[in-house]
UniProtKB/Swiss-Prot annotation:
Pfam families: Filo_glycop
Record's protein name: Pre-small/secreted glycoprotein
Organism annotation: Sudan ebolavirus (strain Boniface-76) (SEBOV)
Gene that produces this protein: GP
Family: Belongs to the filoviruses glycoprotein family.
SS bond list: C108-C135, C121-C147
Length: 372
């Protein structure tokens, strides 16, 4: 009881304190002054509503876009698994959105695919689209396929990340990583936060040896690209290949290349020599150099937010990232028509809000239709 008495106020001071509390509450209602500041990562949906949806986000200058690689979701990054996540579709225009900062990717891809008649499957990159700048391994694949559609999209609705530009489609001959775009909400706009590199910066940042970040290239040939059943060959040289039929790490392919070269198992003719992997060979050597999400909250957010029209909330979970080795997993596949369209819900129209006669008025800077 003595401890509780410390929390009690004398009657006269209680009246004065309650008066000031009511003054603060009324002042906040009148001037929309936020009483709290978001300082941690344990946000509830209602807190996001209070900060973003009730007059506290005055301008999109407070939003900073960041590209997050799908490697953070623990997806298989080998070429046979990755290509199953991509599919062709017609009648859907490509969309591009810029982002200001990103992660260093462990695995990037570069595709040069032709149709049986010799025409190109993938469109050339538009002006200003450059390859993803930070790649530890670049998987360069050439080949042929039916390519049944105008563009190659991501079946799970993710973006293809280029140099500070994210597109919904794959461009020919340009390094890209798989990822999504997230928005950071800043308490106040800061000019120096996440500044973009200079426009004149070199396109291939990995050429700078002082960065201690070397890019290694792995080459492949793909047959029947874009179809349900395709064949992927790892290229040792122009006439020697290895058939890839299971998930594997980049380190395994480098060791495989060294083994074939060391034991002189290369093709000694002008014909194509294709090796197959023994069933007992472990293709998981080395480290699966990406993250795996461990779910610490079994339930999804069930409370609806005013942001639900912009982002899907059905798959959001509280997650914690930590490093570990991943076991082999089956890559989810789906029919070409199962492309999810939540990536088209990202707001591409910038807005700015002002106060007039005590009320907030918002207007779009650039009007752009967002498809549902």
């Amino acid at each position: 009881m003595e401890g509780l008495s410390l929390l009690q106020l004398p009657r006269d001071k209680f009246r004065k304190s309650s008066f000031f509390v009511w003054v603060i509450i009324l002042f906040q209602k009148a001037f929309s002054m936020p009483l709290g500041v978001v300082t941690n990562s344990t946000l509830e949906v209602t807190e996001i509503d209070q900060l973003v949806c009730k007059d506290h986000l005055a301008s999109t200058d407070q939003l900073k876009s960041v590209g997050l690689n799908l490697e953070g979701s623990g997806v298989s990054t080998d070429i046979p698994s990755a290509t199953k996540r991509w599919g062709f579709r017609s009648g859907v225009p490509p969309q591009v959105v810029s982002y200001e900062a990103g992660e260093w990717a462990e695995n990037c891809y570069n595709l040069e695919i032709k149709k049986p008649d010799g025409s190109e499957c993938l469109p050339p990159p538009p002006d200003g689209v450059r390859g993803f700048p930070r790649c530890r391994y670049v998987h360069k694949a050439q080949g042929t396929g039916p390519c049944p559609g105008d563009y190659a999209f991501h079946k799970d609705g993710a973006f293809f990340l280029y140099d500070r530009l994210a597109s919904t489609v794959i461009y020919r001959g340009v390094n890209f990583a798989e990822g999504v775009i997230a928005f950071l909400i800043l308490a106040k706009p800061k000019e120096t936060f996440l500044q973009s590199p200079p426009i004149r910066e070199a396109a291939n940042y990995t050429e700078n040896t002082s960065s201690y970040y070397a890019t290694s290239y792995l080459e492949y040939e793909i047959e029947n690209f874009g179809a349900q059943h395709s064949t992927t060959l790892f290229k040792i040289n122009n006439n020697t290949f290895v058939l890839l039929d299971r998930p594997h790490t980049p380190q395994f392919l480098f060791q495989l290349n060294d083994t074939i070269q060391l034991h002189q198992q290369l093709s000694n003719t002008t014909g194509k020599l294709i090796w197959t992997l023994d069933a007992n060979i472990n293709a998981d050597i080395g480290e699966w150099a990406f993250w795996e999400n461990k779910k610490i909250s079994p339930n999804n957010y069930v409370e609806k937010s005013c942001l639900s029209k912009l982002y899907r909330s059905t798959r959001q979970k509280t997650m914690m990232r930590h490093r570990r080795e991943l076991q082999r997993e089956e890559s989810p596949t789906g029919p070409p028509g199962s492309i999810r369209t939540w990536f088209q819900r990202i707001p591409l129209g910038w807005f700015h809000c002002t106060y007039q006669k005590g009320k907030q008025h918002c207007r779009l800077r650039i009007r752009q239709k967002v498809e549902e």
